[in-house]
């Protein structure tokens, strides 16, 4: 697993240890080829859909019960690490391969899955303008995309269809197609390592909302424009960034978080009063109404600041997704699998959002977390210990076996 993750990390626009792999870039296409080869080497039936999602399937004896699906993404933000997402793909291949290897041995018959098991290399497109995963799960999202953009990007590398609607229709998942979706992932937080716990059993994924706010003033010369005469867009933006923090802390909940991740001012010269300011704001919570209350408060603050500072305001909600709760069957299967392996567990909330958040719209979902060093992620020194990776894959394998409802002698669990 460590070797396979390292090979995958080398398909990057930046040198090791940094990983940059943008969707449908040349290195992403190389990574796709590597993953498909691994699937085939492990006797999985490989297919790709029009959106670019890759599936590897192991058929079961019960075709009517829906597939037990596992997987994650392999794209990587600029200068990221080698475990985010990729663990859930490479680890899933090994988990299913381990179950396949246990089908028979020299002396006994072991595991036979009932529901089919499948792996998914999710086409997330987080770092282009196209929310592919959202479109996959919720085709109405096509109305938010630039005309022709999904088709153009997908067609450039051999995916796509004649129209965006045709592409979305081709990949839409029908109700019942997926019995369960399970995702293995690094925690991207410090709790498991801090508490010395082996496995995180995810009970819910926080609801993300993204806002874009633009303030516009008149600008002017930094020396010639007197302070009483200014309508400084940069200061309006600074006030709003602090207001985000104030409204988030005002909820009194540690589950509410807010980040002003982008703050751009123009013209950006030391001797020029800022004429424009653009803020990208991220607000998350496991409680949807509480999150929405913070969103409303931030937008109200933007209006108050704009009026008081005499700047023009344009704001919009980019996305406002609902939270997702893990299905009880998956939570119990993960906990039982960890217990059978003698591993400690912690029930916890995912404050980062994952492919599972979107899969929750079409299937019961759940997640397995493993510790990562200092909780670091989205940076080159992202790291999980080999033994933690192994624990996560073992728990995933047993969880898939349970959810597939296959035949496996009790003493093998």
Label the predicted regions.
Residues 1-14, 71-72, 345-395, 403:
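Zn-dependent metallopeptidase/amidohydrolase metal-coordination segment
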Residues 47-49, 105-106, 165-171, 224, ...:
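Flexible, glycine/charged-enriched surface loops at secondary-structure junctions
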Residues 22-24, 259-268, 280-286, 312-331, ...:
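A short beta-alpha structural unit
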Residues 203-205, 221, 225-250, 295, ...:
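His/Asp/Glu-rich mid-to-C-terminal helical/loop segments that flank catalytic regions of hydrolases
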Residues 1-80, 99:
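Acidic/His- and Gly-rich active-site-bordering loop/insert found
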Residues 265, 284-288, 318-320, 375-388:
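Short beta-alpha connecting loops at secondary-structure transitions
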Residues 124-126, 131-289:
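Midchain, well-structured core segments that form catalytic/ion-binding scaffolds
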Residues 70-73, 79-116, 209-215, 221-247, ...:
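Alpha-helical metal-binding/catalytic segments enriched in His/Glu/Asp
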């Amino acid at each position: 697993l460590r070797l396979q993750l390292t090979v995958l990390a080398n398909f990057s626009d930046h040198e090791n240890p940094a990983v940059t792999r943008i969707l449908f870039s040349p290195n992403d296409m190389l990574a796709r080829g590597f993953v498909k080869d691994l699937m085939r080497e492990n006797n999985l039936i490989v297919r790709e859909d029009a959106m670019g999602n890759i599936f590897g399937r192991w058929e079961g004896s019960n075709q009517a019960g829906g597939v037990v699906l596992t997987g994650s993404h392999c794209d990587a933000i600029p200068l990221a690490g080698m475990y985010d997402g990729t663990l859930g793909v490479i680890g899933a291949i090994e988990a299913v391969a381990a179950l396949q290897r246990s089908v028979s041995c020299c002396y006994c018959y072991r595991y036979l899955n009932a529901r089919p098991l499948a792996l998914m290399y999710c086409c997330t497109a987080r770092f282009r303008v196209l929310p592919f995963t959202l479109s996959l799960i919720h085709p109405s999202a096509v109305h938010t995309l630039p005309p022709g953009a999904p088709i153009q990007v997908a067609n450039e590398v051999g995916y796509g269809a004649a129209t965006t609607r045709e592409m979305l229709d081709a990949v839409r998942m029908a109700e019942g197609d997926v019995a369960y979706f399970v995702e293995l992932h690094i925690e991207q937080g410090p709790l498991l390592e801090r508490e010395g716990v082996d496995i995180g059993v995810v009970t819910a994924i926080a609801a993300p909302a993204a806002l874009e706010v633009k303030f516009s003033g008149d600008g002017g010369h930094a020396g010639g424009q007197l302070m009483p005469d200014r309508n400084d867009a940069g200061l309006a933006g600074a006030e709003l960034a602090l207001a985000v923090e104030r409204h988030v802390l005002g909820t009194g909940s540690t589950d509410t978080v807010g980040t002003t991740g982008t703050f751009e001012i123009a013209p950006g010269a030391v001797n020029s009063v800022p004429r424009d300011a653009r803020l990208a704001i991220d607000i998350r919570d496991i409680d949807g109404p509480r999150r929405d209350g913070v969103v409303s408060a931030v937008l109200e603050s933007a209006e108050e600041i704009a009026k008081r500072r005499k700047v023009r305001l344009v704001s919009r909600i980019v996305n406002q997704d609902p939270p997702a709760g893990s299905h009880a069957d998956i939570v119990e299967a993960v906990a039982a699998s960890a217990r059978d392996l003698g591993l400690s567990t912690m029930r916890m909330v995912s404050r980062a959002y994952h492919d599972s958040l979107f899969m929750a719209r079409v299937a019961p979902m759940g997640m397995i977390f493993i510790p990562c060093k200092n909780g670091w992620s989205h940076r080159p020194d992202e790291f999980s210990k080999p033994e933690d990776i192994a624990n996560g894959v073992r728990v995933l394998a047993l969880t898939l076996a349970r959810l597939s409802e296959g035949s496996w002698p009790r003493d093998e669990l």
